[in-house]
A protein has these predicted regions:
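Structured alpha-helical
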Residues: 1-64
Length: 64
């Protein structure tokens, strides 16, 4: 499980961490939401600033 921080005023969005590497991650949403180009992802105790680089259905990829 991971959490997405899209905007300081927006609620936190939970998602599934599908795959992770040193340079990025693949995540999956439970339902479709509009993602901004830049987000923050929290998984475990690690919080990373990310850029969304691709999206296919409910899955999307980010680079750190």
């Amino acid at each position: 499980m991971a959490k997405l921080f899209l905007d300081p005023k927006a609620p936190v969005v939970e998602c599934t961490l599908v795959d992770y590497s040193a340079g990025g991650a693949c995540l999956q949403l439970a339902k479709f939401i509009q993602l901004p180009d830049r987000i923050e992802v929290l998984y475990g105790t690690t919080r990373k600033r990310c850029r969304v680089v691709w999206r296919r259905g409910l899955r999307f990829g980010v680079v750190f």
